[in-house]
Amino acid sequence: RAFSAHGLPADRFCHFARRLDFQGFLSLNLASDALLDTLEWSGGKTTLEALGCGLPVVTCPGRFMRGRHAFAMLRMMGLTRTVAADKDAYVRIAVELAHEPGLLAEMRSQVTACRNRLYRDTRFMEHLEDFYAAQVHAHVQAPNAKRRP
């Protein structure tokens, strides 16, 4: 009924899949128009794989970290067009993508163009290397200092 209320045939826009192996999951992503992120418990690896397949992701960030993963990924990519402020906006964005093939194509193109901002970001690695170097340096400077396990 929710799909019908927005003029969308549910059998075209909603698919509940059985458990899939990884290849089947990627194939489903490649055959999909967009990923609707789950509310309150955002997708992590699911979102990463969807973005890797060029799928636009519609999300509504929650109050807690568990509901903000997709938002953080999209923000890192510079793509906040599909980030909803509330549940009503989440539905509006999803319906807009379903009714406007041109917008959907534009969003897919933007995801594909920007995904390396997410996948090739080396800042975390650089910060981790700096942390390790600082810890080694601190240990060399004070080798007998008591440390917490």
Region roles according to the model:
Residues 11-18, 92-149:
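C-terminal amphipathic helix plus adjacent low-complexity
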Residues 22, 27-69:
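A donor-sugar binding/catalytic signature common to diverse glycosyltransferases
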Residues 4-11:
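Short helix-capping segments at alpha-helix termini
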Residues 20, 42, 85-88, 123:
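Short beta->alpha linker loops
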